Amino acid sequence: MRVLGIETSCDETGIAIYDDEKGLLANQLYSQVKLHADYGGVVPELASRDHVRKTVPLIQAALKESGLTAKDIDAVAYTAGPGLVGALLVGATVGRSLAFAWDVPAIPVHHMEGHLLAPMLEDNPPEFPFVALLVSGGHTQLISVTGIGQYELLGESIDDAAGEAFDKTAKLLGLDYPGGPLLSKMAAQGTAGRFVFPRPMTDRPGLDFSFSGLKTFAANTIRDNGTDDQTRADIARAFEDAVVDTLMIKCKRALEQTGFKRLVMAGGVSANRTLRAKLAEMMKKRRGEVFYARPEFCTDNGAMIAYAGMVRFKAGATADLGVSVRPRWPLAELPAA
């Protein structure tokens, strides 16, 4: 069984083909980073228009990469939310139209379920149950996962997501968009301990997060200490350490609360090397395991949508002829498979 996956929720156009026996057959990705760089962030209208230009050519490229034709595709999966409404509509319209033209089922996929399941694409996939840390530019959530669609929200950010805080702080440090990876690179040159940032909401019970205050703390630290290269690197180091420590503390609490021995982290920020190292160290001490996707599958991509679509298709999920998307879509609303 082969599923074509289409991802257009934000500023990456991702197309992939997944075979339930052979694995990933094709993976095509186009990033709009250069398009939005001059604006310091994603411009929704420009994102939608670029998806219109790139989606069909990338589908053609994926078919060519896999050596398949339309007749070989058994279903079409597309991201139906959450995300930018215009961008979502492009992928949903193309996906639904292809499914109709090819006479195959169309499968709407939840973007964050795609991220959550991305580690399943690796050679050593996690088994249920596990705690999932979904950490990206738009989400920071801790989820109890006992099966496909069996998701319980344990905690989430009450303001900025961790990835958003990375990007905003990077901008304060004069880094280009998207600044998160650049901030991490700068932090590697920083001196640990010169500046100490707070670990938000770790001094009270609960599993919720708050990262907006770290941005303000960074702004004040930059204002009071200047912007020479070493100072900027030291501030970046202090900021990254604060975010990573906060995530680690909350993950530890979630594992203690659930009693689970496995931790899965997914989303763009899960590619952060410092975060990976700290969580791996923590899980080793707890005699547990941590799982994550390869870096290219941490950010938005079509492979995770094709895989999630395969899982949902086998569980009987299909869509009618209508094209509908959900810019806001709580993960807990998904049905169990």
From Swiss-Prot:
Query: Cofactor binding mode, per the note?
Result: Binds 1 Fe(2+) ion per subunit.
Name a GO molecular-function annotation.
iron ion binding
The UniProt record lists the EC number as 2.3.1.234
The UniProt entry's GO biological process terms, in alphabetical order, are:
tRNA threonylcarbamoyladenosine modification
* Alphabetic keyword roster: Acyltransferase, Cytoplasm, Iron, Metal-binding, Transferase, tRNA processing
Location of the protein in the cell = Cytoplasm
**Does RNA-binding count among this protein's keywords?**
no
Against Gene3D superfamilies, the record matches this protein to: 3.30.420.40
Q: Which reaction does it catalyse?
A: L-threonylcarbamoyladenylate + adenosine(37) in tRNA = N(6)-L-threonylcarbamoyladenosine(37) in tRNA + AMP + H(+)
Q: Where does Fe cation bind?
A: 111, 115, 300
A Pfam short name: TsaD
So which cofactors does this thing need? Fe(2+)
UniProt KW Protease keyword: no
State where substrate binds: 134-138, 167, 180, 272
Please give the InterPro entries that the UniProt record associates with this protein.
ATPase_NBD, Gcp-like_dom, KAE1/TsaD, Peptidase_M22_CS, TsaD
Q: Which PROSITE patterns match?
A: GLYCOPROTEASE
Enzyme class name:
transferase
What is the documented function of this protein?
A: Required for the formation of a threonylcarbamoyl group on adenosine at position 37 (t(6)A37) in tRNAs that read codons beginning with adenine. Is involved in the transfer of the threonylcarbamoyl moiety of threonylcarbamoyl-AMP (TC-AMP) to the N6 group of A37, together with TsaE and TsaB. TsaD likely plays a direct catalytic role in this reaction.
Protein family (similarity comment)? Belongs to the KAE1 / TsaD family.
**What name has this protein been given in UniProt?**
tRNA N6-adenosine threonylcarbamoyltransferase
What organism does this protein naturally occur in? Escherichia coli O127:H6 (strain E2348/69 / EPEC)
The top of its lineage is:
Bacteria, Pseudomonadati, Pseudomonadota, Gammaproteobacteria, Enterobacterales
